[in-house]
Design a protein with these regions (language model features):
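Alpha/beta catalytic barrel-like cores
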Residues: 1-114, 123-134, 144-145, 149-152
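Conserved, mostly hydrophobic/aromatic
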Residues: 118
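Eukaryote-skewed repeat-based solenoidal scaffolds used as protein-protein interaction platforms
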Residues: 134, 140-179
Length: 179
């Protein structure tokens, strides 16, 4: 059995509350993000800075997981905020982001840590709304890209769980859309 957890390491995210660190200790988290208004005003360069900080901390979290015997980790879906609005190569820090992600992936692969992700409920492949389906493809592609940057195997061992959600009044039609 592999012991693990989903997304937020409470001890690292809140080191003074759940850990043994003094006040003022910086949290380690991959959940940094921004609201749309901030993205619109600060742009892709700020998204790059956030993504880089998240990638560095993913490495720190993976190191902590290995040192503490956690062999399963479900990654955040928010590693790269507003990723559907830009391409990876638009990020000024993409080279360093990829290096940190690869380092985290190497740590996981070397120590047998199973890494998965679970994109949010707004990703709906069976939606009758083509925009929703297209956005879902973009988001799932982003998750796959991150796994590729990490060097994770493309197997069931490193899953990207997806929501099927809703039949929209016609189960057969929804199944056809999904399959």
């Amino acid at each position: 059995m592999k012991l693990g957890y989903a997304c937020i390491n409470m001890q690292l995210s809140y080191p003074t509350k759940y850990g043994d660190k003094p006040k003022g200790t910086e949290s380690i988290t991959t959940g940094r993000s921004m609201i749309k208004r901030t993205f619109e005003s600060k742009g892709v360069d700020y998204a790059s800075e956030i993504t880089l900080a998240n990638a560095k901390d993913l490495h720190n979290i993976m190191t902590w997981n290995v040192l503490n015997g956690y062999n399963f980790y479900r990654m955040t879906s928010g590693l790269a905020p507003w990723k559907t609005e830009y391409e990876w190569n638009d990020l000024k820090d993409i080279k360093e982001i990829k290096q940190w992600l690869h380092s985290a992936g190497t740590m996981a692969n070397t120590h047998g840590v199973r890494v998965t992700s679970h994109p949010g409920p707004f990703n709906v492949l069976v939606s009758p709304n083509e925009n929703v389906v297209e956005n879902t493809f973009q988001d799932l592609t982003m998750h796959g890209d991150v796994f590729d940057f990490m060097g994770l195997s493309r197997t069931h061992y490193n899953k990207i769980n997806i929501h099927c959600n809703g039949v929209y009044g016609d189960k057969e039609f929804a199944m056809d859309r999904f399959c």
